[in-house]
């Protein structure tokens, strides 16, 4: 991606984060929406927006159906968001927005949880071995 497209993608990411937080008031959109990246097509026709969604309660695990529902809500609001985005962008055309759930971030969080559990288990085993030696 060239520098101009990257700057535009960064601006879209910043503006959309504010718009989703402040302007989208759909009750089906539960959780905290984070825009992890934006990729703009070379002809500025489309912008693929990758989002992660975290539940407001730490103990609540979002199921895949919750993610799909949230993505549907965002895609339904894409026209409104595009219109609002056009007021702040200094381009002739505003890209059409396509929202996708960011699997990479979710898998990374899952792997970090697995690593943390493994480290805790290793530390417990080492402390048990030290107690047995004494």
Swiss-Prot record:
Monomer. Binds 30S ribosomal subunits, but not 50S ribosomal subunits or 70S ribosomes. HAMAP family: RbfA. Keywords: Cytoplasm, Ribosome biogenesis. It comes from Psychrobacter arcticus (strain DSM 17307 / VKM B-2377 / 273-4). NCBIfam families: PRK13816.1, rbfA. GO terms for biological process: maturation of SSU-rRNA. This is Ribosome-binding factor A. GO terms for cellular component: cytosol. GO terms for molecular function: ribosomal small subunit binding. It is found in: Cytoplasm. The gene is rbfA. One of several proteins that assist in the late maturation steps of the functional core of the 30S ribosomal subunit. Associates with free 30S ribosomal subunits (but not with 30S subunits that are part of 70S ribosomes or polysomes). Required for efficient processing of 16S rRNA. May interact with the 5'-terminal helix region of 16S rRNA. Its main location: cytoplasm. Pfam families: RBFA (PF02033). Belongs to the RbfA family.
């Amino acid at each position: 991606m060239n520098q101009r497209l990257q700057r535009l993608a960064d601006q879209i990411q910043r503006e959309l984060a504010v718009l989703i937080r402040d302007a989208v008031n759909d009750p089906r959109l539960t959780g905290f929406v984070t825009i992890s990246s934006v990729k703009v097509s070379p002809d500025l026709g489309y912008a693929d927006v990758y989002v992660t969604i975290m539940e407001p309660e730490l103990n609540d695990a979002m199921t895949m159906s919750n993610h799909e529902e949230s993505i549907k809500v965002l895609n339904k609001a894409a026209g409104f968001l595009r219109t609002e985005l056009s007021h702040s962008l200094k381009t002739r055309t505003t890209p059409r927005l396509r929202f996708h759930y960011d699997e990479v971030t979710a898998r990374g969080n899952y792997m970090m949880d697995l690593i943390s559990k493994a480290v805790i288990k290793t530390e417990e085993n080492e402390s048990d071995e030290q107690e047995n030696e004494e």
